[in-house]
């Protein structure tokens, strides 16, 4: 129904077919994806796209690359914040991402996105193919991020769990 395509258009990964994409009253319709990330928009796509040959730690560092000239102390602070959200990632910080379970990869994908310190976090089907206990852990983290002031745009098939943490549903 075009949900993923809409997220991709907001992210600058595909051209919008028509209309404008506004962020804080600024037209970002024709902006490049890296610029959109620098403006505070993060898109965590469906399918747990991690860098399999990089460690958990290296994946998190990669998430901060769009943040130009981020001081090393701030980079470490953001990594520690992700380890607080997902303690399991800290335990596996030197593990190659490709050897992790699907749930752990999803945690890493979300945490890597949060490394850019977004104002808007867009999540596309974060529970897809995951065990119920992992889904609960991920949604608890999403709720913490939302309560900390980050706007979350969530595309999710599991309506019951999504509605539990939502302010609005469409």
Segments from the language model and where they lie:
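Glycine-rich phosphate-binding loops of nucleotide-dependent enzymes
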Residues: 1-170
């Amino acid at each position: 129904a075009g949900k993923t395509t809409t997220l991709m258009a907001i992210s600058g990964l595909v051209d919008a077919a028509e209309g404008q994409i506004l962020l804080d009253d600024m037209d970002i319709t024709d902006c490049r994806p890296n610029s959109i990330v620098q403006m505070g928009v993060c898109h965590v796509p469906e399918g747990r796209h991690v860098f399999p040959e990089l460690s958990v730690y290296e994946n998190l560092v990669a998430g901060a690359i769009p943040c130009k000239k981020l001081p090393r102390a701030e980079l470490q602070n953001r990594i520690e914040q992700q380890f607080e959200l997902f303690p399991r990632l800290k335990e596996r910080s030197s593990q190659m991402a490709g050897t992790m379970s699907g749930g752990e990869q999803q945690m890493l994908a979300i945490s890597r996105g949060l490394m850019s310190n977004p104002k808007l976090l867009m999540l596309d089907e974060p529970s897809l193919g995951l065990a119920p206990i992992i889904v609960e852990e991920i949604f608890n983290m999403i709720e913490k991020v939302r309560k900390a002031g980050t706007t979350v745009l969530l595309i999710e098939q599991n309506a019951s769990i999504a509605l539990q943490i939502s302010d609005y549903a469409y």
